[in-house]
């Protein structure tokens, strides 16, 4: 299995878990059983068009990946680049405009924004929406609120997919990205831990358990001004690891970790599910979706972790064929794998430029259907 297959698996697994858990988000467990049977939801609950819909969690994850590649392209072509998280505001605000005005700015900042499903109004995070409406993002130095919510977590996924050599950088970038909308240290540090888990699995080909050990070791030496919060998160992660090998029933294990509305709880539930079903993405996502809490986020985390571990080629077709935006997600995943193929002195690449410089790729592609794909992309 190559890195491309693992990155594809991570992004499709994330979206698939989100789509599986979305119809049962916040439903009581009794209601889930009443609607879907004793096993709960085990397959997509399709919309009227036969599509498994993603939510704002996946939408913002994709926009974050788009933002990283935009930043890298700017750095490659201009030789200078601001901190990566500082490029996200335009992508998030453009997405927010569609949520509130039904139309985005004339100058879209991300090529995926041309696809209506990338900004359809579904399972919006109240915390993020309040921040977007204020037109002012937070930072680790100036928190914008005191939210510990899990709405920041999936934005960490592309960070783990994009970086591998510097754990401290990954932790810091993911924490700064979370701090844009969530002001509590527990949200920041949970996002950092999640990004690092992703990186270890994808780039080092570690098992999920091995990735957890390395992540805990890195956490123990990070955020020295926030050790109380770090240790709180580490206890939650260790509880998930312990429960994964226990005789506890699925629901009892999940209940002991929380409902998933708080970042550390969502991460722990997703991790628990992935550890119990490391080679079975259907089992992991089903486990993580069938509880009376933040089902789409916990199932997305589980799907991402197992998808990264087993790769796209091992994900059952039933979770791919009907998934909303599947072709866009795969194309973006391949771009994450390739990263910017240009430099300020090398040849141009029209496909890449229209994605990550001009940001008009969908329009340009319609006018240039025969344009060649990126020659630097691994196939």
Region roles according to the model:
Residues 1-379:
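Structured, active/binding-site neighborhoods that engage oxygen-rich ligands
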């Amino acid at each position: 299995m190559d890195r491309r297959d693992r990155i594809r698996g991570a992004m499709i697994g994330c979206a698939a878990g989100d789509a599986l858990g979305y119809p049962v988000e916040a439903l009581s467990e009794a209601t889930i059983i009443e609607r879907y049977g004793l096993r709960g939801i085990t397959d997509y609950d399709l919309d009227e068009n036969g599509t498994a819909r993603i939510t704002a969690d996946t939408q913002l994850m994709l926009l974050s990946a788009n933002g990283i590649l935009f930043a890298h392209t700017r750095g490659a072509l201009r030789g200078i680049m601001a901190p990566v998280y500082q490029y996200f505001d335009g992508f998030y605000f453009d997405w927010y405009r569609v949520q509130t005005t039904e139309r985005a700015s004339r100058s879209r900042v991300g090529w995926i924004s041309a696809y209506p499903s990338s900004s359809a109004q579904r399972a919006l995070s109240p915390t993020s929406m309040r921040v977007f409406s204020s037109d002012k993002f937070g930072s680790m130095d100036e928190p914008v609120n005191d939210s510990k919510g899990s709405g920041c977590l999936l934005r960490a996924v592309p960070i783990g997919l994009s970086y591998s050599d510097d754990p401290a950088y990954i932790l810091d970038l993911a924490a700064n990205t979370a701090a844009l909308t969530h002001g509590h240290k527990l949200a920041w540090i949970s996002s950092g831990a999640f990004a690092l888990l992703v990186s270890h699995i994808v780039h080092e080909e570690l098992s999920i358990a091995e990735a957890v050990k390395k992540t805990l070791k890195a956490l123990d030496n990070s955020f020295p001004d926030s050790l109380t919060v770090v240790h709180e998160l580490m206890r939650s992660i260790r509880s998930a690891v312990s429960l994964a090998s226990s005789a506890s029933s699925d629901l009892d294990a999940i209940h002991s970790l929380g409902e998933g509305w708080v970042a550390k709880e969502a991460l722990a539930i997703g991790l628990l599910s992935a550890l119990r079903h490391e080679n079975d993405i259907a089992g992991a996502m089903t486990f993580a979706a069938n509880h009376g809490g933040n089902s789409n986020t916990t199932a997305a985390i589980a799907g991402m972790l197992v998808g990264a571990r087993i790769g796209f080629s091992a994900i059952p077709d039933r979770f791919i064929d009907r998934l909303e935006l599947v072709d866009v997600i795969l194309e973006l995943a391949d771009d994450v794998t390739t990263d910017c193929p240009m430099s300020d002195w090398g040849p141009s690449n029209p496909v890449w430029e229209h994605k990550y410089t001009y940001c008009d790729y969908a329009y340009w592609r319609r006018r240039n259907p025969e344009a060649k794909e990126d020659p630097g992309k691994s196939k």
